[in-house]
């Protein structure tokens, strides 16, 4: 690229950032002439009502001294059942203040005998203060209150203990975690402020997006266990794990034509494969359908007996990739069901309801009160809702939700029979007891929120599914280009809005799929982790505040340089959206027109500046220096990868060889393995001749 063109791009970016800064510095939301100045991160604000985040922490009127002169009078007293959370509290109080906070495990505590942080001794706490009702706090809510110079921390579950621990630390020492190697304390921890906090997470199941160590998952507030049934294949697209190839031979109607679940493996033995699809109607054969329900329910019941932590199981079709090119079963019954409901979701929901009845019978007789959901994966051929339509569009009720269809079953010839309820009336197809659905719109435009026109088609499907009676919406969202892991995907500013949108329709379980194969992916994946951790807990979190805080602490003195790079990447992607599009399964993001060589080279030079900005820590705080240097190194992988793969002809043979060696070493040393979902980096580097 000519230098003049490069300068023009930089000038354009500079003008945009000048106006962005002008807008950000104003005290209100309007400019002097009444025209708002739009920035990349200036999106319409949505707010979800009815959440519980009642936080009152008063440092101006402290009720005690938490630590002074290298000591504390406080002891953390915890129920032994919550040792993980209470140890976490003691550890970080000690780290923040430099004072050892002793931890004792007991089921009782005499508050008059000393100064205490009482953690999870609920009978004592309830006898001392009035705690919110269980229906308000739910399973993971908590209540924290100072009484005199004691701190009482109430919760009712291990997940609640985790969140209560984080809230307590935020109040006492200003705790936060941006990544496993970036923990901050914004308060000195010397005074004990007056505290009264009642909170409940907006999503109970907050699943981390990218590959993450357990310490980070805990410290950032992600749910430790999803409760989703895990088989040998995983926790999705795994129904074939309930069958053998003998089942395919003996019960061919349980599968689409040509299905293979097991075959001879190279070197002997059997290997599991997923070719074809489950048939959720058993080809319309009533006896085979009943046998299928019995087969599945017996195996699920055995799992429930042995795995008390299992809360959910996905009812999902196989993914269409590799050898499997079958989207759905095309037997007469399945085709008739698809034509009637307009989606595979009708057959899947009917199957899930029938299966749940058998599983619920076991639960009622043997484990009354146990929560277990069969979750229909609304994905691909099942994405659309099995509800009433009018002129090809979803018919909605007065609340803007789908109107259920009458349920029909279909026989081997595709003829339909109405299903009657216990009163002999036509049954409506809704989510029965212990049945939910998970929305997984892999073809949506995930650089735009579901409030925006770009996703109206997919938002309408969520609104339609919402009429089918499930109290909890499960969401499988997407937040990176799966064909180009190393490229930045410009969705940062819409993450919170999507959390809000899904919450408005009952969102309670969310998994935003990211680079699940890489530990330290570039493209500001760590920023997404941080935004996700906050937004899943409180959907009304402020995006700009989160981004500002992240850069301030994650990069320290290098923050201005790295923020400028981040802003330029966002603007560059915004002005090139007509090229990249927003699909997560597309190669548009790596189009050469989006990443001119001079622009990428300029960004690469900025990382040298960033590294120089943190050099002072090399001698004074080696641990901090290593963390900051690593953070910068992670982000450098993207422009280096572009130069190594797209502009190798611009360098001599020896130069490009060293660049590629250096890139590959850093990429792998950072714990990364793949450049594209399911495809390892050696698929690219094997042709680099690095020997």
Report the location of each language-model feature.
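Feature activates predominantly on carbohydrate-active enzymes
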Residues: 67-69, 73, 81-88, 92, ...
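Bacterial signal peptide processing site
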Residues: 26-28
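Glycoside hydrolase catalytic-domain groove-lining segments
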Residues: 397-400, 430-432, 439, 444-479
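C-terminal motif of bacterial Sec signal peptides marking the signal peptidase cleavage site
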Residues: 20-24
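Catalytic domains of carbohydrate-active enzymes that cleave complex glycans
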Residues: 106, 421, 506, 532-691
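Aromatic-lined carbohydrate-recognition surfaces of secreted/lumenal glycan-active proteins
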Residues: 352-388, 473-482, 510-513
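Structured mid-domain segments that build the active-site/substrate or prosthetic-cofactor binding neighborhood
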Residues: 287-292, 302, 455-560, 564, ...
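Acidic, contiguous N-terminal accessory segments
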Residues: 32-143, 183, 188-198
